[in-house]
Amino acid sequence: MAGKGVIVDFDFAVANGSEILFKTAKEFLKELDGIKLDESLEARYLAGNGYEDGFSRLFAVAKTKKTAPKAAREFAAAFARQLTDAVPKAVGPSAKNFIKALVEKGVKLVVATRADLEAVKSALAFVPEEQMAFYRETSDCYGACRWDTWLRAAHDAQIGRPLARALAGSGFSVRSALRAGLGTAAVVTPHVAYQDFGGANVILDELSGKTAKKFMEALRI
């Protein structure tokens, strides 16, 4: 249906942001004060929380004197750099087929990202300009978009809430998209498979031409 738009959590639904985030956090914390991060600690203290809040909780357990606000700012910049480096590889043939299938249906794509916008625009240059919008994601939520991100992205692209759909890359993003009142699809990668994806209209294990059809049918596009 023409007029509908898909808000894409590029960092976690297109790029393998959950793995990049974990690796970045692991290296960052080790260099910061020798703090060892594993998947269990990440899930318990960081996932779904704001950077500062998550670090504050983790630092209390690690008994470090490092301050969470400063660490959060530095970590956000480090993640953005790593994410930007991964952009070209993220938009490979399979992801392109998924995107092209939506474009052929007249769907407008609104890409929310923390990566460098010029890098993302370059990777998506095959999409007609009139069917593409970009939103600078500024929230500091670890591994997810906040609920108001979805609404702001839709508003900036002039897509009414009833016509907006969300493509999320984590259980926390599914929850926030549902809170925003959006029909939601989720791309589930191994690193986030433990999260709760309940409420998503459809679960995808990858982006491809085949899953694009499944996506559009489930979300009535």
Task: Cite the ranges covered by each PLM segment.
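Short glycine/serine/threonine/alanine-rich loop segments
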Residues: G34-I35, V107, I159, L182
